[in-house]
Amino acid sequence: MGLTRDLPTQASTQSIAFRVNGSAASSPVAGAAVGNRMVRLDGKRKVDGSEIFGADETPAGALAVRAIRNPHHRARFTFGDLAKFVRDHPGIEAVFTAKDVPGVNCYGVIGKYADQPVFAEVEARHRGEAVAAVVGDAATVEALQVADFPVVWQELPFIQDIDAALAPGADRIHENRPDNILVRGRVVRGNVDEAFASAEVVAEAEYETGFVEHAYIEPEAGFARRVGDQVEIQACTQAPYMDRSDIAAILGIAPERVRIIPTAVGGGFGSKLDLSVQPFLAVAAWHLAKPVRMVYSRTESILSTTKRHPARMKLRAGCAKNGKLMALDFAADFNTGAYSSWGPTVSARVPVHASGPYYVPNYRALTRAIHTNLVPAGAFRGFGVPQAAIAQEQLYDELADRVGMDRLEFRILNALDETTPTVTGQVLGAGVGIRACLEALRPRWKASRGEAEEFNSTASGPLRHGVGVAGMWYGCGNTSLPNPSTVRIGLKRDGRIVLHQGAVDIGQGSNTIVTQICADMLGAPIERFDLLSGDTAITPDCGKTSASRQTFVTGRAAQMASELLRRGILDLAGTCECATLQFDENGVTVHEGGTSHLVSLEALPLDEHGYVITSEATFDPPTSPLDENGQGNPYAVYGFGAHMAEIEVDTELGTVRVLRVTAAHDVGRAINPTLIEGQIEGGVAQGLGMALMEEFFPGKGENLHDYLIPSAGDIPPVESILIEEPSPIGPFGAKGIGEQAVIPTAPAILNALHDAIGIRVRKVPATPDRVRAAILASKSVNGETRG
């Protein structure tokens, strides 16, 4: 029996299989999974080491693949005698270059902007770009000296900063993109100029943020093999179906002839949405018909993969004397590097969000993604919104100070609600929890502000304390674009439930969350499920793991598919909707009123999927396109939050220590509070790094010695406050949390820095040298003695 429901379109096919094994201590009773702090379904495997990551498997006889990369910021190149190189190096089996790509030597995450070659053809546009791949036995490939490879480089003038890229007469990074502008973003509402003319208080500022490396624990890795006229790739990824489409185009074959099998992922944060090892593996496996394996070193990973966009932002805000916001004018340029990657998404998402979660009746936000000869900037937890929050939340503090308002109360006064339109004109109607988040911080805010003032008033040494706050909002899913998820559920003759869901769990817990949702919709215990996740040959397409969409979108599709399966069982039993189901080793028992009926499954015929009943549902969040002024409904659901940071500053050294973070987040419904708290704590850690230490300099910091990330000693206690303002269309009211958790941390810390010592660091991160320089500059302006 097959049951399908599409809302509104699309199904395909994806998986890693494992049986859910629970215990009385770890698994909730039937019907009580949602809201339960059950342990992750893959938790034991991660702890005992049995989980399979990208580098953990090597097929028998697999050859090693190694990329030859451009060592310069920009260079032309020519090859010597590659055939002779292979002959002269026993153990090397082949060298592949652009001419060996069977299909299109171009890929990209957004089709119309695709511009990145598998192998550069004549010119390498950035340091670390691949020009060739060497394939051979592992020992020989690993021992190969790059200087022995026959390639001659001709260094070319290069562009690294936005001003140089935009300068008249600047070299074009891509001939078809005048002025090196990849794309522009725009949201305009009301009359900004008139509003500023009547605003009683105005503040303006400029902020700059740098490159940030993802620094996940697992560098990119995987293997591939050709199976007849198909190719299979097992690798770490956030987007198996996107990978499949790109690899098919690169090989010049139909997508159905490419199978992507995601491994467990040791962190992604957006970078593993882009291809890494996959094209090299695919080309080598296709030509050689042998298994091939590739594992990036940490240096290679940092050198060649995407980063958070550096941003240069200029903004101005105005309000009335009572603190009500009247206008915001925001302009930002993002350094998108040599190739497009997710630059268009960043440019589109930021103008929607740069107001923050506040009612701003007159608004203008203009963005540009600018090409340079740097490693591509791509997706990184928040798609540019964390950069915008750093600017807008500090400016709102300045406005609050100028009107003499408490900084938290200023935000509460201006917070969006269910009836006020956003800057795109969208009225959300329900599920707007920003005011509740801000109000949840109020007791701690008042107490901490008093403690900091008391400390500073009696401090005789260089230490000062400060408290800062910042709000956030974030749309779940793609911006005004379709982003459906399809989930299939099958009931076996023995009463076990097989969940086919293609959402890749990159550490956030989607395998567990989606299973909890299905369990409660069916009234089944977690132990009755077998989970298949993230394999393009086995599970339907659940879209990419990004944009805080999996709990909301895939979770909703799973809820719908579970509802269909339940109806199918009730139809078999001939009972009404009010009946309840009991799943156990005997099959399924239907309870209605005072009677019970065992549904016999063993005699039922199997459908095309091998189940007695199969249900499938697709959910695509309802959005609308934005018009030329960015007006419309870009997201169906938004997550909201607010963070408060307490810090200590050493005014002699310029060092900042975060003492505590209190984080309030509107999650709609907390499907698994423990997993949500984990996301919040991880977001705080990344936000702290962005605020105080993380900055990547190409060619200078391609290792984790020179590139600083927070260590355990840097992470403060984090108090998480979960607010539940349900979304009418989320599964059990749930929203996303993955990206929301990182956005307000950095601005809260930077606002606390100003609260402590009265300075603003306009270029982030606020490293000790920058903090110290700002202190000295402030003393100079105020006529104090330097020291």
Which residue stretches match the model-derived regions?
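Flexible, low-hydrophobicity surface segments
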Residues: 2-182, 202, 287
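C-terminal catalytic domains of large/alpha subunits in multi-subunit enzymes
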Residues: 2-8, 98-101, 252-257, 287-292, ...
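Glycine-rich loop/linker segments at domain edges
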Residues: 36, 42-48, 179-222, 228, ...
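Short, aliphatic-rich beta-strand segments
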Residues: 65, 231-235, 496-501, 658-660
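Short acidic, glycine/serine/threonine-rich loops at helix termini
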Residues: 106-110, 144-148, 244-246, 269-275, ...
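Conserved catalytic cysteine-centered active-site region
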Residues: 123, 254-256, 260-262, 285-297, ...
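Helix-loop-helix junctions that connect adjacent transmembrane helices in secondary transporters/permeases
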Residues: 170-251, 415-496, 703-721
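Thiamine diphosphate
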Residues: 264-289, 293-294, 510-517
